[in-house]
UniProtKB/Swiss-Prot annotation:
Name of the protein in its database record: Acyl-coenzyme A oxidase acox-1.4
InterPro entries with a match to the protein in the record: ACOX_C_alpha1, Acyl-CoA_ox_N, Acyl-CoA_Oxase/DH_mid-dom_sf, Acyl-CoA_oxidase, Acyl-CoA_oxidase_C, AcylCo_DH-like_C, AcylCoA_DH/ox_N_sf, AcylCoA_DH/oxidase_NM_dom_sf
Function, in words: Involved in the first step of peroxisomal beta-oxidation by catalyzing the desaturation of fatty acid-derived side chains of ascaroside pheromones, which regulates development and behavior. Specifically, shortens ascarosides with a 9-carbon side chain (asc-C9) and, in association with acox-1.1, may contribute to the shortening of ascarosides with a 11-carbon side chain (asc-C11). May contribute to the production of indol-3-carbonyl(IC)-ascarosides in association with acox-1.1 and acox-3.
Enzyme Commission code(s) on record: 1.3.3.-
Reported regulation of activity: Activated by ATP. ATP binding leads to a conformational change that promotes FAD cofactor binding and enzyme activity. ATP binding likely occurs during acox-1.4 folding and/or dimer formation.
Main location: other
Residues holding substrate: K284, V285, N286, H287, R294, Y432, E433
GO cellular component terms, A-Z: peroxisome
Length: 662
């Protein structure tokens, strides 16, 4: 029995050679990645079950389809899946449900994507028990299809300035929804354009002439029998995008559209029949749907980065180019140190992001329980943390995927690699659910408040995630991982204090708070990034420390060492005032050492994500490594190759050439 369970006899021998170098069981590594042996095994079982249903296979490669074909193909597969899904998965298990959708439809989006990821979670976190009894069961059974509509054409991150209104009329106990301007149109929500017949819509709630800010409403958009938009609803598709073109992101407008008072989601707030407003226990409790998505983004982005690295690492193991010592056979591209430096730090980040995501998801689940018990003390901590993570993780994921594409050379530019599609999907995360710079500044506000508490002698009030800001700095001992944490704490602490002092001094000089803040934002965002990267390192360390399987723990410890050395070098300018050049040279040498240590395990590390070829959709990243013959096969399937002479050539180019001969 091979340690790497991906080995098969028909594979490219170069890839088999790499897999035989592995020192750990890839199934056991998968158990660490996905949380347990049972969860990892269920993923494999689901993938295998899906592979046995031929109707769920793509009718042609996705890159050769236009938008309508992609949406139609996604809907066709969902209909087939709906007839089989309860025989394959436990439908009440969110993880199994998400995995089977990814397996069947890939990552380009489908009509139920936001239904599962945003609509249902919004009902779970925002609707009262009575409202859940009315709508949640129908949503889970897919009697209705919903989405989450918050972003507007003119406003996204600044929720306080949302223009769509819901005005309450006590005499009829109804809210009237209205879109007063073009910029007030809801814009971008996935599945809104053509698929959803319901939406959780976030609007500015007005009662007796007073604005109460953004609140979520359950709104029916289309007739359940005909799917025609209801009177007073303007809804449609916003057109092609950089990616996600298997989905129908849409626009939505209201013209004096009435909904019952009880359509306001009332788990945390309430409006009485007479218009009395009962406010939530915490100012940001209505943001829980956003916090939910941001809590999962680290894991989701880590998975996207992992897919790009599966492709790039496998391809680098079968692609031969140039010579080293052996002049008779070209060397594997993966043997070049530059290729390792390009890919392995991103591989470490993929693991780090996934492990960090586990922590934030656990914190979010605990927060929901606490809020139900009336305890909202953890809301500010988690809101700040997930804001920073959302920004740092999406940005670094985009960087890593682009490096993976370039590491594949010219073929990486082809849609046959599928990396460009992964990139387009991943970098969407830099702007949806909050623009990244704004997210960093939300965390920065929390850091500034924390520093101000310390300055006022109230350090005891600090949350656990920022307690290090009150600690005394020291010189790091780089002989242990804790020494790297000490170094990162010092840099993050120093930058947080530096940015806060700059902000406060500007106000002392006479600048208004707003202007002083704006003039400090570059330093503040730097503080947020350092704080977030520190948390990721600590989350990675905590996860590795709990692993029981020795071979798995050893290779992940090597990956962790690679991660901390790379991360520290990446921000070395912040370390110049307290670390010597000798220490920085040591870190650089350690980085190169761990590149060499990871090299034999690289293919097994990416195989451990256990992403099927069906989901990966990459010719370059095929499990069997038989790239070149399948690249030729893929190219021949291009619709342009259905005829030897294109109509455009016959109609325009041939006459042009004939005319030139006269």
């Amino acid at each position: 029995m091979h340690l790497n369970t991906s080995i098969c006899e028909v594979d490219n021998p170069d890839l088999t050679e790499e897999r035989e170098k592995g020192t750990f069981d890839t199934d056991k590594m998968a158990a660490v990645i996905y949380g347990s042996e049972k969860l990892a095994r269920r993923r494999r079982e689901i993938s295998e079950a899906v592979s046995k249903i031929p109707e769920l296979a793509d009718t042609q490669p996705f890159p050769f389809m236009d938008r309508l074909e992609k949406i139609t193909e996604g809907s066709r597969k969902l209909e087939v899946l709906n007839n089989n899904i309860r025989d394959i998965i436990d439908y009440d298990d969110n993880g199994e449900r998400l995995h089977i959708y990814q397996e069947v439809t890939g990552m380009e989006g489908h009509p139920l994507a936001l239904h599962e990821v945003m609509f249902i979670p919004a009902l779970v976190s925002q609707a009262s028990k009575e409202q859940q009894e009315k709508w949640l069961g129908r949503a889970r059974r897919r009697e209705i299809i919903g989405c989450y509509a918050q972003t507007e054409m003119g406003h996204g991150t600044n929720l306080r300035k949302l223009e769509t209104t819901a005005t309450y009329f006590p005499d009829t106990q109804e809210f009237v929804l209205n879109t007063p301007t073009t910029t007030a149109l809801k814009w971008w929500p996935g599945a809104l354009g053509k698929s959803s017949n319901y939406a959780v819509v976030v609007v500015d709630m007005i009662i007796k002439g007073k604005s109460y800010g953004p609140h979520p409403f359950m709104v029916q958009l289309r007739d359940e029998k005909t799917h025609i938009p209801l009177k007073g609803i303007v809804v449609g598709d916003i057109g092609p995008k950089m990616s996600f073109n298997g989905g129908d992101n849409g626009f939505l407008g209201f013209d004096k559209f009435r909904v019952p008072r009880t359509n306001l989601l009332m788990r945390h707030v309430r409006v009485e029949a007479d218009g009395t407003y009962v406010k939530p226990p915490h100012a940001k409790v209505n943001h829980s749907a956003m916090v939910h998505v941001r809590s999962h983004m680290a894991t989701g982005q880590g998975a996207l980065l992992a897919q790009a690295l599966i492709i790039a690492v496998r391809y680098s193991a079968v692609r031969r180019q140039g010579f080293l010592e052996n002049k008779t056979q070209e060397v594997k591209v993966l043997d070049y140190q530059t290729q390792q430096h390009r890919l392995f730090p991103s591989l470490a980040r993929a693991y780090a992001f996934i492990f960090t995501g586990f922590e934030t998801i656990h914190l979010y689940s605990q927060l929901l329980k606490d809020v139900d018990m009336g305890n909202t003390s953890g809301m500010a901590d988690l809101h700040a943390l997930t804001s920073g993570l959302k920004s740092v993780v999406t940005h670094q994921t985009g960087e890593g995927i682009e490096q993976a594409r370039m590491a594949c050379g010219g073929h990486g530019y082809s849609m046959a690699s599928y990396i460009s599609e992964i990139y387009g999907i991943a970098i969407g995360g830099c702007t949806y659910e909050g623009e990244n710079m704004v997210m960093l500044l939300q965390l920065a506000r929390y850091l500034v408040k924390s520093v101000e508490l310390i300055k006022s002698g109230e350090a005891k009030k600090l949350g656990p995630m920022v307690s290090y800001l009150a600690a005394k700095g020291g010189h790091p001992d780089l002989s242990s991982l804790n020494g790297y944490v000490t170094a990162f704490e010092h840099m993050a602490r120093r930058q947080a204090w530096k940015a806060t002092e700059k902000f406060l001094k500007l106000m002392e000089s006479g600048e208004s708070r707003e202007i002083a803040w704006n003039k400090s934002t570059v330093e503040l965002t730097r503080a947020s990034r350092l704080h977030t990267r520190l948390f990721i390192i600590e989350a990675f360390m905590r996860r590795v420390s709990r692993i029981e399987d020795i071979p798995v723990k050893e290779v992940l410890t090597d990956l962790l060492h690679l991660h901390v050395n790379y991360e520290l070098l990446d921000v070395a300018t912040y370390a110049l005032e307290f670390m010597s050049s000798t220490q920085l040279d040591y870190i650089r040498d350690q980085l190169y050492l761990y590149l060499e240590k990871i090299r034999p395990s690289a293919v097994s590390l990416v195989d451990s994500f256990q992403i099927s070829d069906m989901q990966l959709r990459s010719v370059l990243g095929r499990r069997d490594g038989n790239v070149y013959e399948n690249l030729f096969k893929w190219a021949k399937s291009s619709p342009l190759n259905k005829s030897d002479v294109l109509p455009s050539v016959d109609k325009y180019l041939m006459p042009m050439m004939e005319k030139a001969k006269l």
